[in-house]
A protein has these predicted regions:
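Structured, solvent-exposed acidic/aromatic patches
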Residues: 12-171
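Acidic, glycine-rich segments characteristic of secretory precursors and extracytoplasmic regions
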Residues: 1-11
């Protein structure tokens, strides 16, 4: 996003650029917290509820889109922050969470992306009319594009692991 790109294109000699160059965030900003906010606050239980309600109603397009967004978001979060609370993230009333290791999150991201593809390849029980195409600002409800997106999430996820010693044995 622009918070990361602006220091690269303007004022290269300033101290804020030095902070960015050393730490990959703009000084005095919350750019590093944006991934947490996206996963836990902006999407959070809204995305969980959308997926659960869509699966219960057999509205596979919405469930697939939800899983694809969830996979992408968690992949991004673990790339930026490493370990994060995943399994206990949305347990009601829990005030302290155990962190999950990055490899567990990477594995779960692939599960969610594959689940997105599986859901998007199913026929919906409901005819949405134009509700999805008018409200999906990313791909306009185009299932084929969402499937490609989910495959891209898997590819990005595995690309992060290619230099691991055990990559060929595990994947």
């Amino acid at each position: 996003d622009l918070r990361a790109l602006c220091p690269l294109t303007q004022m290269m000699g300033t101290s804020s650029y030095t902070t960015f160059a050393n730490n990959y965030y703009t000084a005095a900003s919350d750019a590093g917290g944006e991934a947490w906010r996206m996963v836990y606050w902006n999407q959070g239980m809204n995305l969980e509820n959308m997926i659960n309600q869509s699966e219960a109603a057999e509205n596979w397009t919405l469930a697939g889109i939800g899983y694809a967004i969830k996979a992408y978001s968690w992949d991004f979060l673990t790339k930026v922050n490493g370990e994060a609370p995943m399994k206990q993230a949305f347990v009601p009333g829990l005030l302290s969470h155990e962190y999950d290791y990055q490899d567990a999150i990477y594995d779960q991201v692939r599960v969610w992306a594959k689940k997105a593809i599986e859901c998007l390849e199913k026929e919906d029980k409901t005819n949405y009319g134009t509700r999805i195409s008018q409200n999906d600002y990313i791909y306009g409800g185009d299932k084929a594009k969402w499937i490609k997106f989910a495959y891209a999430v898997i590819a990005r996820n595995l690309a992060s692991l290619t230099n691991k010693n055990d990559f060929k044995q595990k994947y």
